[in-house]
From Swiss-Prot:
GTP binds at D22, H23, G24, K25, S26, T27, N139, K140, I141, D142. The gene is lepA. Belongs to the TRAFAC class translation factor GTPase superfamily. Classic translation factor GTPase family. LepA subfamily. It catalyses: GTP + H2O = GDP + phosphate + H(+). Its EC number is 3.6.5.n1. HAMAP family: LepA. CDD domains: EF4_II, EF4_III, LepA, lepA_C. It is found in: Cell inner membrane. It is a peripheral membrane protein. Residues 10-192 form the tr-type G domain. This is Elongation factor 4. GO terms for biological process: positive regulation of translation.
Amino acid sequence: MGLSISHSMKNIRNFSIIAHIDHGKSTIADRFIQICGGLSKREMAQQVLDSMDLERERGITIKAQSVSLNYCGRNGEVYHLNFIDTPGHVDFSYEVSRSLAACEGALLVVDASQGVEAQSVANCYTAIEQGLEVVPVLNKIDLPSAEPERVCQEIEEIIGLDASDALQVSAKTGQGIEELLAALVARVPPPQGDPASPLRALIIDSWFDNYLGVISLVRVVDGCLKPKDKIKIMSTGQHYRVEKAGLFTPKRREVEQLLTGGVGYIIAGIKDVDGAPVGDTVTHVEQFATKALPGFKAVKPQVFAGLFPVDSDDYEDLREALAKLRLNDAALFYEPETSQALGFGFRCGFLGMLHMEIIQERLEREYSLNLITTAPTVVYQVLTSKGEVLRIDNPSILPEPGQVAEVREPIIQADILVPQQYVGAVIGLCEEKRGTQKQLQYLGNQISLNYELPLSEVVLDFFERLKSVSRGYASLDYHFSRFQSADLVKLDLLINGERVDALSLIVHRNQAHYRGRELAEKMRELIPRQLFDVAIQAAIGAHIVARTTVKALRKNVTAKCYGGDITRKRKLLEKQKAGKKRMKQVGSVEIPQEAFLAVLKVGKKP
């Protein structure tokens, strides 16, 4: 079924779905595509919109996707639905705000057996702040454990939305999906915009195709956009000619023009990876708009790690791969870095640990790169004794203790929603992570906890630990609050008396001895035995806090002596001893990749 172009603006509906991980968002999208005939039965793969292999394997949505469908309403009119899919994980909240900027409405999907989760609350507030019409939907209503009344009450108490007319659906069986589409058309307002004004289109997303160059997903706010139009990117002032324009149905389908209020893609032969920045405004070259659209708030990376190619010949390929991923993922930051231990690579900034894992996995899969990742660290502020304030995102560049007046660490505000029976375990975890409780509220049978926590304690394993102490029921949303002075020190690792810059950590002084001892022990297990003793030391400045030794392998040099004179044996042993001494002075120790990752495991409780 084709999509006709003659849709008037009053029949366009732009919407997205807000939901926590696993609440059935991608399955609802599949049902919409099925009912509106976007794909034939043969082409309907499960989770059509989660097109990345990685998304299907992990069962999460990483990249926002878009799809345009035709829906024949109960009044006989044909409506044009533009659905923009959004991720649900806390690391990808930036993608969500980007998707919502292109919509007039949102479906808040809540699992009827689990209830409201913190991430949905945060995204829902973002939608309400942006003036979207939010329609509450209860999914998985077919489950025996579904409690629609309790969940409706939670939506009203926690979010403050009227849930008396919440729609009850089961995306798996298809129950209630028709009613949901009808309610969507009735309750979400049509887009506002002026077809006669000069063109203004917002770039929601961009990605790179090796044959076509940059493909941009745009939302046309004013005017219209046709192939052969000459366009200008407002921030860079660069001119391009539109080669193709079209819609995702979810297959790519070309159209004669993108109308006011519509969402579609354009291909304009942009070969430069930075040619169409996300959040930018597209206008015509001749009749151009003077005022750009408000873009998205620039997002700051929270976690930094070094990425180094195992083979130094891959350095340029890594640079190219990062540039292409950066186009599609505005939250990724990178700059060149050199390490004495690992050679040339990049210092990369991420939104969180999941974001980091996914970028690393995409680089390895999509670009066939073999990488070493150093331990992730957060950004610290350092006040030097001269009164300068430095931003430190790499422990190896922290100034010497004598030059530091104070070190400030980033503090976050964490909102945790947890069922009452697990609240004790969650509070215990927050205390262990140096958290300060700010608020505790009872909401139905859930408890809302507000904590201030150091970001460095949260990035490594807080999310996994929170899930394990609450049997998977607690949910977390956090945002940066401020920098606060703390007693932090740099923990260095010395192997045979040499500092290995890639293994340095910034830790709280109270934990330094424990972390140092644990790190040294881990290294002892991972570093292969040599023909000489390898000393592993953990140090704070010049003060050694822990030491272990990888014992030497012993070669039996006296095996060929049968009985005979003891001096013959002694001579061979002395010769071996001298050889080992010389070897220890010049011999370098090969550190395996697992050793760099062991830093991540330090401080984790099994």
